[in-house]
Design a protein with these regions (language model features):
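Anionic-ligand binding patches
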Residues: 1-4, 11-150
Length: 150
């Protein structure tokens, strides 16, 4: 089965392809109109992107949305994780907002939602969570997004 992945992120394309290949699913990319992420949850945004791509291509489409939610900040940055603060300053912004906050109040979780929309209207969705704390400073040089502080 051929499936479109609604992303321009080369790492995600490679990762999805590797995971789905043993199931006989071939991931493809397409020049897609970027869907506006107007959802209030990660699951809604994943659906919006997958549905838009499916409508545009007529093929099964998969999309994801993910981000970091910090308890002390009432769930910020949440669905705005990729657009939170200025690019390159997101981690520093979080650390500044949590400056002086004790460890026991630095709880956070990472949410990842994935959605697959089929041309016949079928929808498959899943959501997962990883719980932890926000560090007081960045650790390590590798990692993606908020990884060095989570």
């Amino acid at each position: 089965m051929n499936m479109i992945i609604a992303t321009h992120n080369a790492h995600k394309i490679e990762e999805f392809g590797r995971i789905l290949a043993p199931l006989g699913i071939t991931m493809q990319t397409a020049e897609l109109t970027e869907a506006e992420e107007t959802g209030t949850t990660f699951r809604e945004n994943a659906y919006i992107k997958a549905k838009s791509a499916c409508d545009e291509t007529g093929l099964p489409c998969v999309a994801d949305d993910s981000g970091l939610s910090i308890d002390y900040l009432n769930g910020e940055p949440g669905v705005y994780s990729a657009r939170y603060a200025e690019p390159g300053k997101r981690k520093a912004t979080v650390l500044e907002k949590l400056k002086g906050v004790p460890e026991e109040k630095r709880g956070a979780h990472f949410t990842s939602a994935i959605c697959c929309v089929f041309p016949n209207g079928d929808v498959l969705e899943a959501e997962g969570y990883c719980y932890g704390r926000i560090a007081e400073e960045c650790h390590g040089e590798s990692g993606f997004g908020y990884d060095p502080i989570f």
